[in-house]
């Protein structure tokens, strides 16, 4: 018996079956650098409009986490896919380098030493810290296979960037939008600074809940309420007892009904709808409602503060609700936005007598020196002592906490710098831009940011810290009046731009060189000045990146095509960027905003140290390779929260292996093919043209998915193409033709041509996601076949020949696929019975009606080869024997399966009745004999 296996054209390739990604990926990164693959990618075949994706800067603090990886990989997929579609697109990564987290870390490192160091020395340490971590993060991002201008990123701490940020402040000043005033803002007593809404997180917190009576000695009580003022009180409810010392009024709703409830000789005013529940809370045994009045009737009555001998008038406010409490709201204008607005309306004092640590000043009787949370029990104790505490309890509720130190924050009125939302119509313009000028992806993002902008207060842009861009203004030391002049401020900005460390100039330079000569305070005539010590909100820093980067870098153009970050940035970077741009340019800085969800564990829980369910990107890279992380990003709909677990990663590894093995098989069948051997698509065998049609339509679906940012569709389309359309169908059929036919025969070259085009489509579609693997596959394409492009990322759509079938021809092939599926079903019981083993042992007879037979004939397919059997006979439906399989899916089809006649060819394993046509090869079929004797 001859060893005919050696005569078969089995797949040959050096492309390894085992990916060995953890070792191979670093080698590929070096290769990309050596070949300048990134530059080649964006400069090759740039025939369409450029696409600008502007990077939201991550914070230069700590190692990257999976949220960073998700974000950067999505951006990389977009940049690569846009370039490969002919849209030149560069990626300019950035880092947010200023702000509280870095300053905190530096304070911890410096300890007591910080108190003796000048501001610029502390800032120098902050700069070093930020530089250290941006270098660490840069390496980690590059390891993910993300391409970009890594050697020329934008940093918010460079002189040029700091000057650009300060310049935007001056623009707002020129428009009259910048104001300095005393308003309640979020305040962190631990960090001793104002906080933006985006810097506040909500966590469960247990607070004291108290009901307090305010005596109403006003003589008009007798007339309006019909009660003795000496026995009448108005009742409030609060969960912040520490604000009671700062109470200035009690607010009621003008349209609500308020009851005067008598109990045990005393009269209490509260909302009629809540009277019964309050009476139960207070333990009143026999309450009686003696009168009801509207809230409007109560306006102007004067209550007495429950602790101090001062007045607390009754005022009206539409924000009062009946959801809980008493319908009468304790009002402290120094500790709440609505309270503040009510205070302005009624001329109440904006009273907030505490220092930056949140401790009451010495002027506050009974509570001096206590911080707000220490004061809570003391206030309750004092109220009880004075007989004004009606009830107390504990309540667990969602409460604002500092994003950095995780401590509860307070609302506190302090003198801060604001950008007015009403001056120059900023709110109205921003809302109009949200509706008309931006594509929000997903669409729900539009309503989210719209409601935030619609309801937000003025933008507090000042922070009481060191590490940031200073607010360019002076303070009169005599009267605390602020002064700035836009021409003077613009001159300071240029100093920042030309200073080696940017706005360190403000902190290093002597005051005499900052203050204009002879400057006199316009308010008091004072001549002694101090620099403003506050710095700009870091959200103003990053929010002006459009001015520092998008408008300045030659790789970019304003407005950017896209901003892309996590969904929390509707109140963060998207928000501040929108206000900064609309406020100075009149238009948003972006045409589209795309958001992704958070990374959660396999059960949908947030990653948490306390749960211990966190996974670092490096762990996954070390175990599986970055390619699996990239595949994970593309496998899920990132617009929702994205799950990750060992089980999910294991499934992805299996899917990756199937895609890789498909690529390897395709490569293996190209080893003896050159570009000159490729046949025109129109001359290919019908099955090969159908396979190309399948691959081309998959390619178009993939490209549409890239355009629509639906990368999960890319993953599923590619996986299904490899597993179902190729491995389980086309390549399975093709084996006989590729292995057994004459090497240079037309039928084999037809198959190889199709395999080549399918592989080229596949690696094009893979490259934005499976970048390492696509490049590796491309490098293993035989040199005689490989295009001139140095990198897979230089391949373009223009290089693809037309490969789609006419619709009518495709319909015939789809009918064939349906028949093939029925043949497989019909064969199952015959194989189970042992009558035949391998499908090649079978003789299939198709009994079909004329219409179905005509469709199969129209395909021109070799049915024997396509069904992977040894013989196929087609007969009229009427001739079908009674025992023939009847298709439930296709009308007009019955199938008989029998053992193939003849003997099995030793070379191709197909059964033939014509074995032994050559005495030299007596065990071969005529086709195999012809191949060997040619």
From Swiss-Prot:
Keywords from the UniProt entry: Aminoacyl-tRNA synthetase, ATP-binding, Cytoplasm, Ligase, Metal-binding, Nucleotide-binding, Protein biosynthesis, Zinc
CDD domains (alphabetical): Anticodon_Ia_Ile_BEm, IleRS_core
Chain positions of motif 'HIGH' region: 58-68
Coiled coil: none
Entry annotated with the keyword Zinc: yes
Pfam families the record matches: Anticodon_1, tRNA-synt_1, zf-FPG_IleRS
Gene behind this protein: ileS
Residues reported to bind ATP: 609
Organism: Oleidesulfovibrio alaskensis (strain ATCC BAA-1058 / DSM 17464 / G20)
Gene3D superfamilies referenced in this protein's UniProt entry, alphabetically: 1.10.730.20, 2.170.220.10, HUPs, Ile-tRNA synthetase CP2 domain-like, Valyl/Leucyl/Isoleucyl-tRNA synthetase, editing domain
Name of the protein in question: Isoleucine--tRNA ligase
Binding site for Zn(2+): 905, 908, 925, 928
NCBIfam families per record: ileS
PROSITE patterns named in the record: AA_TRNA_LIGASE_I
Cofactor note: Binds 1 zinc ion per subunit.
GO BP of this protein: isoleucyl-tRNA aminoacylation
Entry remark concerning the domains of this protein: IleRS has two distinct active sites: one for aminoacylation and one for editing. The misactivated valine is translocated from the active site to the editing site, which sterically excludes the correctly activated isoleucine. The single editing site contains two valyl binding pockets, one specific for each substrate (Val-AMP or Val-tRNA(Ile)).
Enzyme Commission number: 6.1.1.5
